[in-house]
């Protein structure tokens, strides 16, 4: 599994060759630099560490400054490991979107979903509420209803769907097609939506 780090730019829409309307997401993918190459001999597994998005030196910790200096690159904000790069890579090498992907590829996109705060069961789990407001009912339309029996089992089971914090979790959207690659701007256009808000980091995995 090879991939690259990107930043969500926003959503738009295009028409495909047949004339179908396709909603899509624009992602700024790279350029990323290789800051570490892990091998079985030294680390116990094989992986490549990529870094993306420049960062001020004064905002970087000294251990990380040393790490970037060893790779011969300027400080970066986001560091992620990827496994599965087949071709030979060198420390400090730059990887752009067109080096990893071509138009028509199907990719998985990983990101952090927007935080929604404390939400009820209708929004959080898609409950239908408890029916019409009849027979005197006036304040239970969007409540969960029963969460268990009384004397048996005399407890609420783990995992029962209730109100609570929604979003702000890691989400992977699979099998999104790359509709267009713009090498001059390091942009990918993928079909559908991806998790996160504008300017949030995403991982594009092949």
Curated annotation (Swiss-Prot):
Signal peptide location: none
Gene Ontology molecular function: any one: rRNA binding
Alphabetized Pfam families for the sequence: Ribosomal_L3
A GO cellular component annotation in the UniProt record: cytosolic large ribosomal subunit
Keyword DNA repair: no
Keyword annotations of the record: Ribonucleoprotein, Ribosomal protein, RNA-binding, rRNA-binding
One Gene Ontology biological process: translation
Claim: Ribosomal protein is one of the keywords in the record: yes
Main function: One of the primary rRNA binding proteins, it binds directly near the 3'-end of the 23S rRNA, where it nucleates assembly of the 50S subunit.
Subunit description: Part of the 50S ribosomal subunit. Forms a cluster with proteins L14 and L19.
Family (UniProt): Belongs to the universal ribosomal protein uL3 family.
Protein name, per record: Large ribosomal subunit protein uL3
Phylogenetic lineage: Bacteria, Pseudomonadati, Bacteroidota, Cytophagia, Cytophagales
Gene field: rplC
């Amino acid at each position: 599994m090879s991939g690259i780090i990107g930043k969500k730019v926003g959503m738009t829409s295009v028409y495909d060759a047949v004339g179908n309307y396709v909603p899509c997401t624009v992602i700024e993918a790279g350029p990323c630099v290789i800051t570490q190459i892990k091998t079985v001999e030294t680390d116990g597994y094989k992986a490549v560490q990529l870094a993306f998005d420049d960062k001020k030196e004064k905002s970087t910790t000294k251990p990380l400054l040393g790490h970037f200096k060893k790779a011969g690159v300027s400080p970066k904000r986001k560091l992620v490991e990827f496994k599965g790069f087949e071709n030979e890579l060198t420390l400090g090498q730059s990887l752009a979107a067109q080096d990893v992907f071509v138009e028509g590829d199907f990719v998985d996109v990983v990101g952090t979903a927007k935080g929604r705060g404390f939400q009820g069961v209708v929004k959080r789990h898609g409950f239908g509420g408890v029916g019409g407001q009849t027979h005197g009912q006036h304040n239970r339309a969007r409540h969960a209803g029963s969460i268990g029996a009384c004397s048996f089992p005399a407890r609420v089971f783990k995992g029962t769907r209730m109100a609570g914090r929604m979003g702000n979790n890691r989400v992977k959207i699979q099998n999104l097609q790359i509709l267009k690659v713009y090498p001059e701007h390091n942009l990918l256009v993928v079909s559908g939506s991806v998790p996160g808000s504008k300017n949030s980091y995403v991982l594009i995995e092949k």
